[in-house]
């Protein structure tokens, strides 16, 4: 019974990461700034890796791996991110900040369970990735680095004209 419970919790984490991939897809489809796109794509790749890592454990414990597609909750997250992203880069990042804060809280809660050392180590590693994501997105919303990038491009094109 405990093993089934552990598999269910691992599946929940894997599904959360699969849902995050969909949200990143939605944001990336609307963000034109290369600087932001590159960073968000890196975070998307992290979430894909999390799904793969968690699925390996799920399979090892006899469970059914999670598909890399959003469930109902993930579809809602992706739709909300897509709609918000239509209002520009800052709005897209605010939506992603909410998604990453939720993911961070979920990983923090997951670490309250009694896991084997191998599983705990993996969840801690993923949580550190999530912290890095939320810190970058929060800072990007605060400092708007894409505006500096636009200004630099604009200044450079004026100098050449």
Labelled PLM ranges:
Residues 1-161:
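Iron-associated oxidoreductase/ferritin-like identity signal
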């Amino acid at each position: 019974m405990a093993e089934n419970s552990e598999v269910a919790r691992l599946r929940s984490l894997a599904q959360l990461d699969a849902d995050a991939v969909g949200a990143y897809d939605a944001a990336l489809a609307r963000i034109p700034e290369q600087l932001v796109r590159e960073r968000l794509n890196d975070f998307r790749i992290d979430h894909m890796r999390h799904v793969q890592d968690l699925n390996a454990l799920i399979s090892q414990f006899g469970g059914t791996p999670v598909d890399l597609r959003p469930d109902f909750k993930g579809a809602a997250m992706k739709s909300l991110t897509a709609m918000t992203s239509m209002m520009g880069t800052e709005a897209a990042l605010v939506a992603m900040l909410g998604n990453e804060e939720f993911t961070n809280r979920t990983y923090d809660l997951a670490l309250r369970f009694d896991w084997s050392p191998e599983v705990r180590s993996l969840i801690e590693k993923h949580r550190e990735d999530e912290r890095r994501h939320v810190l970058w997105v929060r800072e990007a919303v605060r400092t708007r680095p894409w505006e500096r990038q636009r200004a630099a491009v604009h200044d450079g094109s004026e100098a050449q004209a």
